[in-house]
């Protein structure tokens, strides 16, 4: 049985952070990124359509789920322009909202670069693997993937389910608690 795999877009499929930093410089707080996205980038179609692809899936994702605030049509156009698999896009407009209610039952596993999304999804019953990125390396190696190769995802998913996932809540509360 093939896994139903869901994907985040920014910093999982495409590079968001480097084009952002090139344009705005290093933020002093994460809230600066949110403010610049909500006030400036929300209107900049070319920025979103021209983000470079950093990880290309070798499978058809079940869905994409993103916290992008612009028109969903721009995300679809980005996928088409970059010859990426087109799948349903679930968009969460609030950065602090959980992706879990939108995707639970629709995927077997979700791939995200955000530690907060990774923790939230796993705590809410959606197995999530962490796409390796410079900004998330404080999380350990278990549950981390380095490509969007289906075989790597399946291997990591099976290991994750057999080891960390059953005790995820206890481990997270011990670490961040």
Ranges and model annotations:
Residues 89-95, 143-159:
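Short acidic-hydrophobic, aromatic-tinged amphipathic segments that line or gate anion-handling sites
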Residues 1-45:
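Active-site neighborhood of HAD-like aspartate-dependent phosphohydrolases
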Residues 1-7, 170-177:
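Non-catalytic pre-domain segments flanking phosphatase-related domains
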Residues 8, 63-67, 111, 131:
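Short hydrophobic segments within beta-strands
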Residues 109-149:
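Acidic, Mg2+-coordinating phosphoryl-transfer loop and its flanking beta/alpha structural elements
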Residues 14-16, 22, 71-75, 99-101, ...:
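Short catalytic/ligand-binding loop motif for oxyanion handling, primarily in non-cytosolic enzymes
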Residues 85-107:
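Donor nucleotide-activated moiety binding/catalytic core segment of transferases
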Residues 54-82, 92-93:
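Substrate-recognition element of Asp-dependent hydrolases with the DxDx(T/V) motif
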């Amino acid at each position: 049985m093939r896994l139903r795999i869901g994907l985040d877009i920014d910093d999982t499929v495409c590079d968001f952070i480097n084009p952002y930093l090139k344009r705005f410089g290093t933020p002093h707080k994460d809230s600066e990124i949110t403010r610049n996205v909500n006030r400036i980038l929300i209107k900049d179609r070319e920025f979103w359509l021209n983000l470079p692809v950093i990880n290309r899936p070798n499978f058809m994702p079940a869905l994409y789920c993103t916290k992008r605030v612009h028109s969903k049509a721009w995300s679809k156009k980005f996928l088409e322009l970059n010859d990426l698999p087109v799948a349903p896009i679930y968009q969460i407009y609030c950065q602090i909202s959980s992706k879990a209610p939108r995707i639970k039952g629709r995927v077997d596993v979700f791939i995200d670069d955000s530690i907060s999304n990774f923790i939230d999804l796993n705590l809410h019953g959606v197995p999530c693997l962490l796409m390796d990125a410079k900004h998330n390396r404080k999380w350990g190696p278990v549950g981390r993937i380095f490509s969007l190769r289906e075989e790597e995802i399946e291997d990591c998913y099976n290991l994750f389910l057999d080891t960390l996932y059953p005790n995820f809540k206890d481990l997270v509360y011990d670490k961040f608690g």
